[in-house]
A protein has these predicted regions:
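Substrate-binding/charge-relay-adjacent region of secreted/lumenal peptidase catalytic domains
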Residues: 1-35, 42-43, 47-322
């Protein structure tokens, strides 16, 4: 289905206009943001108006670790006015906090791996300086061809101003003996320089790794979406759902324990994933490196137990774990 066909099937212009008129009557300014499409409204008003409308209080929060840049203004809870209840599923920038994180284990945690199986030992011959190469992955997964159709587009998603270095991608390609390929387009935050990446490895580790390997295994047009938003649902609605020609495969390596994700955030993302599925888009999500227990159990065995991870738990994505060899 095309975007217009899905919009005709799912949009609710009556509800959208009702919310639009109500916000204006309360004194809010409606922002003409075309990226929101027929599903969302963006508005600006003094914080006192939002506190009164949603029966809440906003505060400035910063992470206790000090690693987060700046603070965010959020509330602990909010209530949608009864008059809007039938038309509003969630309100962004209220209770959504930056829980999302990379689903990969730190490098040091991989160094104490158990003894390899016989199959893994055979695959070890395809290692290069003890690093996993695209050639090894091709062998392990039975991939016979890495070239793809130019219309089979793919994309990497990144959060929290994570970056990548185009020069680092070229270095990787040269190191493993692949032809040089470039990212077709960067939307949002990124790229950066090698110097910035070297100064802070965490700044580029996710973006560099994700791009290097997806481009190596599937040589098709590749896009990089970098967002500073804390909301996965907000990003996917604005940048992907509203695109007339979104990437055909979207890879997401970020996630959070589902208990920390608001119901509105979850439902909005799920609706967007369903919308994109109708349009032939596949969303691939990392289920993490920690099995069912989530990262909380890495250093605290008492926290072992089943902990669903979002967005991997969404029924309209393909959750991907590891393969043991």
């Amino acid at each position: 289905m095309t975007k217009d066909e899905v919009d005709d099937l799912t949009a609710n212009p009556t509800a959208l206009q009702f919310v639009h008129d109500h916000l204006k009557s309360m004194g809010a300014t409606i922002l003409p943001d075309q990226s929101l499409g027929p599903y969302n409204i963006k508005a600006r008003a003094p914080i006192a108006l939002w506190e009164s409308m949603f029966n809440t209080e906003f505060y400035a929060y910063s992470h206790v670790s000090g690693h987060s840049s700046g603070s965010v203004v959020r509330a602990e809870k909010y209530s949608v006015p009864t008059i809007l209840d039938a038309h509003v599923s969630s309100v962004f920038n209220t209770i959504q906090t930056p829980h999302m994180k990379s689903q990969k284990l730190p490098l040091a945690n991989h160094l104490n791996a158990p003894k390899a199986s016989s199959k893994a030992q055979k695959l070890a011959s395809l290692l290069l300086d003890n690093l996993t190469t695209p050639q090894l992955l091709n062998n392990a997964y039975g991939i016979s061809e890495n070239s793809g159709h130019p219309k089979a587009t793919q994309a990497i998603f990144s959060m929290y101003e994570q970056l990548y270095s185009a020069d680092d991608i070229v270095t990787f390609q040269n190191f493993v003996g692949l032809p040089q390929e470039k990212v077709n387009q960067t939307i949002g935050v990124g790229p950066t320089t090698v110097a910035v990446c070297n100064a802070d490895n965490d700044k580029c580790a996710e973006g560099n790794a994700d791009l290097s390997y997806i481009m190596a295994l599937s040589n098709t047009p590749t896009y990089y979406y970098g967002t500073s938003s804390f909301s996965l649902a907000e990003w996917i609605q604005a940048d992907i759902v509203q695109s007339s020609d979104p990437p055909k495969v979207i890879s997401i390596s970020y996630g959070a324990d589902e208990i920390y994700v608001s119901q509105g955030e979850y439902e909005d993302f799920k609706t967007s994933a369903l919308n994109l599925g109708l349009r032939g888009v596949t969303i691939v999500v990392s289920s993490g490196d920690d099995g069912v227990s989530s990262p909380q159990a890495r250093n605290t065995p008492a926290k072992c137990g089943y902990m669903p991870g979002f967005p991997a738990s969404c029924p309209f994505v393909t959750a991907v774990g590891a393969t043991q060899v």
